[in-house]
């Protein structure tokens, strides 16, 4: 992990819907909660615009974050983020404390590379389909990857890349695979465009008819 994210936070005593509305309207902050780690949950308030800017960076969602509560720092991950149903406004955030000695479950983005240069695409006209854009991993906080790279260069036409095909950093496991082989889900594939198979079939039939 190459980036550090620090979120300024403030103790929050007033709770409830009315207090949360005042917080958002008058102070430009949103309510948040920090929980887990064998400690009591801590209600805090954080600057709305600061958080909104931070989440523009994809890495924010797969990093260990630092929440600074007036000098007291907590290491956390973002577990949930609530948004207004139709306005570009954040309404609440949940942060989970992390311990360097305990594994965490985090959704990490998948970065697909060599999509355009893969022979099945460039030479055979295949189309890449993404079944997943992120994957839940299990690891110690210090091993948390910013993203997982999926190289499509060697993927052949009609081949499917599964979770078990992912190349994971040391100390990182795919959560779904811990539940057995039945959970080895597809991640991406390369296939012919719609209509191409039908055209191929018609071409084969025409060749057979010509031979007669």
From Swiss-Prot:
GO terms for CC?
Answer: cytosolic large ribosomal subunit
> What species does this protein belong to?
Marinobacter nauticus (strain ATCC 700491 / DSM 11845 / VT8)
The record, for CDD domains, names: Ribosomal_L25_TL5_CTC
What Pfam families would the database entry show?
A: Ribosomal_L25p, Ribosomal_TL5_C
- Please identify the protein, giving its name as recorded: Large ribosomal subunit protein bL25
Gene Ontology terms describing biological process: translation
Entry-linked NCBIfam families: bL25_bact_ctc, PRK05618.1-2, PRK05618.1-5, PRK05943.1
SUPFAM superfamilies per the record?
Answer: Ribosomal protein L25-like
**Region annotated Disordered, chain positions:** 183-212
Quaternary structure, from the entry: Part of the 50S ribosomal subunit; part of the 5S rRNA/L5/L18/L25 subcomplex. Contacts the 5S rRNA. Binds to the 5S rRNA independently of L5 and L18.
Membership in a protein family: Belongs to the bacterial ribosomal protein bL25 family. CTC subfamily.
Superkingdom of source: Bacteria
Q: Which UniProt keywords apply?
A: Ribonucleoprotein, Ribosomal protein, RNA-binding, rRNA-binding
Query: What functional role does this protein have?
Result: This is one of the proteins that binds to the 5S RNA in the ribosome where it forms part of the central protuberance.
Compositionally biased spans, kind Acidic residues: 201-212
Query: What are this entry's molecular-function GO terms?
Result: 5S rRNA binding; structural constituent of ribosome
């Amino acid at each position: 992990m190459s980036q550090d994210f620090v979120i300024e936070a403030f103790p929050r005593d007033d709770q409830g819907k009315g207090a949360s509305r005042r917080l958002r309207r008058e102070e430009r902050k949103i309510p948040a909660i920090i929980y887990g780690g064998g400690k009591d949950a801590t209600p805090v308030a954080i600057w709305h615009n600061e958080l909104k800017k931070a989440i523009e960076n994809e890495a924010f969602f797969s990093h260990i974050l630092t929440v600074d509560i007036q000098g007291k720092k907590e290491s956390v991950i973002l577990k949930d983020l609530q948004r207004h149903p139709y306005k570009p406004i954040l309404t609440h955030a949940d942060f989970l404390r992390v311990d360097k000695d305990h594994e965490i479950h985090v959704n990490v983005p998948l970065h697909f590379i060599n999509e355009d240069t893969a022979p099945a695409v460039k030479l055979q006209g295949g189309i890449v389909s993404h079944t997943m854009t992120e994957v839940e991993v299990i690891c110690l906080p210090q091993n948390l990857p910013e993203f997982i790279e999926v190289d499509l260069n060697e993927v052949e036409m009609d081949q499917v890349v599964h979770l078990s095909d992912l190349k994971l950093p040391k100390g990182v496991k795919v959560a779904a695979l811990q539940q057995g082989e039945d959970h080895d889900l597809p991640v991406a594939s390369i296939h012919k465009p719609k209509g191409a198979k039908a055209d191929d079939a018609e071409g084969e039939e025409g060749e057979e008819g010509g031979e007669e």
